[in-house]
């Protein structure tokens, strides 16, 4: 309700079995966007090892990727990160997917940066800046304006400089 999505065509489910997920998604119209959170907890009964192992993560991701290619659905595989920002658990999925994106920012800050580490279809040196509002995440179309608005005018020892993040100039 807070995000204004009460009537949106969104369905939620809680499941970690890839076979059950694919079976459910195959019933009726296939969703255009599927979010799996998190790939490290998925498991498939085609592999005899514990969830989270390299074998399970790879097999689960492969099954979901096959489903996406067969149906044309877009699947976002969420992977959690460690405290130092590395993808938690096995890193095999990075080599299987079309893009690896990270959402960076401190929990106490209202701004987040979306950064691309891999992108088969475009540049990896681009960023997106977003602001967490009461209505959810909103794109910051002019990050320079945002950064300059927080600047104290007349502060000794400060300067504005033009930098480049990807192809985007940032002040």
Predicted regions and their residues:
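Short hinge/gating elements
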Residues: 44-51, 82-83, 156-160, 171
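Long C-terminal interaction/binding lobes of large macromolecular proteins
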Residues: 36, 75-77, 91
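Substrate-engagement module of ASCE P-loop NTPases
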Residues: 55-76, 80, 96-107
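Conserved inter-motif catalytic segment of the P-loop NTP-binding fold
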Residues: 1-66
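Conserved P-loop NTPase
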Residues: 26-34, 40, 105-171
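Conserved nucleotide-binding/hydrolysis micro-motifs of P-loop NTPases
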Residues: 2-6, 16-20, 39-42, 54, ...
């Amino acid at each position: 309700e807070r995000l204004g999505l009460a009537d949106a065509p969104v369905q939620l489910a809680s499941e970690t079995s890839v076979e059950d997920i694919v079976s459910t998604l195959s019933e009726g119209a296939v969703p255009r966007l599927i979010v799996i959170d998190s790939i490290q907890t998925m498991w498939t009964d085609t592999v005899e090892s514990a969830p989270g192992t390299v074998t399970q993560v790879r097999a689960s991701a492969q099954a979901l990727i096959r489903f996406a290619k067969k149906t044309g659905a877009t699947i976002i595989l969420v992977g959690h990160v460690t405290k130092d920002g590395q993808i938690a658990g096995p890193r095999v999925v990075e080599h299987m997917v079309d893009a690896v994106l990270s959402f960076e920012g401190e929990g106490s800050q209202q701004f987040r940066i979306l950064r691309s580490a891999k992108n088969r279809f475009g540049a990896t040196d681009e960023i997106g800046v977003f602001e967490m509002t009461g209505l959810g995440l909103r794109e910051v179309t002019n990050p320079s304006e945002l950064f300059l608005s927080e600047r104290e005018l007349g502060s000794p020892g400060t300067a504005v400089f033009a930098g480049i993040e990807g192809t985007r100039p940032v002040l």
